[in-house]
Amino acid sequence: MEGCCMQLPTNVSSLRGTIEVPGDKSISHRAVMLGALASGRTVIDHFLPGADCLSTIDCFRKLGVDIHQDGTNVIVEGAGSGGLREPAAVLDVGNSGTTARLLLGILAGQPFHACLVGDESIAQRPMARVTKPLREMGAHIDGRDDGNYTPLAIRGGALRPLRYTSPVASAQVKSAILLAGLFTDGVTSVTEPHRSRDHTERMIRLFGGEVNVDGLTVSIAGPQSLRGTHIYVPGDISSAAFFLVAGAIVPNSEITLKNVGLNPTRTGIIDVLERMGADITIDHIRNEETEPIGDITIRTSTLHAIEIGGDIIPRLIDEIPIIALLATQAEGTTIIKDASELKVKETNRIDTVVAELKKFGADIEATDDGMIIRGKTALYADGIVVDSHGDHRIGMMLAIAACCAKGTARLERPEAVAVSYPAFFADLRSLL
């Protein structure tokens, strides 16, 4: 499929059915990483076999960890404390910012040298937000623009504890520092301006570690040793978001999504749908290990515009592209603000979302830190060609936009969706 142009479903009269979205990308990454650091075996069920998470597996294999992956099932034979080996080859994170930033935190605590590279997109994403605090802890990191961009060379070991106030609410920054803290003698803490997703904190506890949370400050007392465990990875709410929006805006639709992760640091998309007036219900809420999960049903809804900003942004930052599409089908003017972090994702998602949705006739404009969307707008696809720009979330958003549009549309670089949702197009077809 790479490099081709895919015909998208348009003129869709309804979407109906039940699907189970793939495992959560954030949790899948962390499960492999902590399993690699733990003593003993870790068994991961419902792992996401997307390109990003496979990059994480590849990197830890190069660090000497025995990992067996068969589809959505993964077994990690943990290396234990001090068990990682100096890699003979460069560590290629591919397109995965999570792999890059969290791996830097782990490597900071290792008494050896490693080189980290990625694809063209990663080479443009800022790493100083992670390399700066890790350098303050004592890690030696060199790279382009004083360590702000890959390729990066790192030599770790002999870290000092750090009390760090992060300028951004970023789970990747927080996690990198906490992971380095596992190898540090003393208490290391991170204070954020807003609460970011907390999968790392929950998972460290699942592996037998201790993490303290006090308001916006998370701290860890090191060094700590982890024990292998069993993990069921919930369905990724960021992947579910595309079908939640599709169910709300495509006529005559009803979609049920099974076993979706409902971590409260990730459910901003549900809050937005409810505030806009969506017909949404959540059933069978229960806990799997440390994460809440449930089944979500969404039906075609009459929506109204809202303002989105402030504390909710870290809880839905990855969902903003599909929320922008949602807003085109809501009556009134929706304002998305405080989301400048979108500029340093796989693409500049502010500019990319605006440019691509305008091809469908959306009334949308970019701002310095978000977007303004005026609805409700009929979407048209007069033989248009839209482009994922190699960004998985842009590609999936455009496929849902096409479902609402009259005419015909094709998508360039559809293969990008495999980063987080390899079966996305198959699941979409199953609802037609």
Curated annotation (Swiss-Prot):
It is an enzyme of class 2 (transferase). GO terms for biological process: amino acid biosynthetic process; aromatic amino acid family biosynthetic process; chorismate biosynthetic process. One of its GO terms (molecular function) is 3-phosphoshikimate 1-carboxyvinyltransferase activity. 3-phosphoshikimate binds at K25, S26, R30, S170, Q172, D318, K345. InterPro entries: Enolpyruvate_Tfrase_dom (IPR001986), Enolpyruvate_Tfrase_sf (IPR036968), EPSP_synthase (IPR006264), EPSP_synthase_CS (IPR023193), RNA3'P_cycl/enolpyr_Trfase_a/b (IPR013792). The active site is at D318. Belongs to the EPSP synthase family. This is 3-phosphoshikimate 1-carboxyvinyltransferase. PROSITE patterns: EPSP_SYNTHASE_1 (PS00104), EPSP_SYNTHASE_2 (PS00885). Phosphoenolpyruvate binds at K25, G97, R125, Q172, R349, R393. It is found in: Cytoplasm. Monomer. One of its GO terms (cellular component) is cytoplasm. Catalyzes the transfer of the enolpyruvyl moiety of phosphoenolpyruvate (PEP) to the 5-hydroxyl of shikimate-3-phosphate (S3P) to produce enolpyruvyl shikimate-3-phosphate and inorganic phosphate. The lineage of its organism: Bacteria, Bacillati, Bacillota, Bacilli, Bacillales. Its EC number is 2.5.1.19. The keyword ATP-binding does not apply. It catalyses: 3-phosphoshikimate + phosphoenolpyruvate = 5-O-(1-carboxyvinyl)-3-phosphoshikimate + phosphate. It comes from Geobacillus thermodenitrificans (strain NG80-2). Keywords: Amino-acid biosynthesis, Aromatic amino acid biosynthesis, Cytoplasm, Transferase. Pathway: Metabolic intermediate biosynthesis; chorismate biosynthesis; chorismate from D-erythrose 4-phosphate and phosphoenolpyruvate: step 6/7.
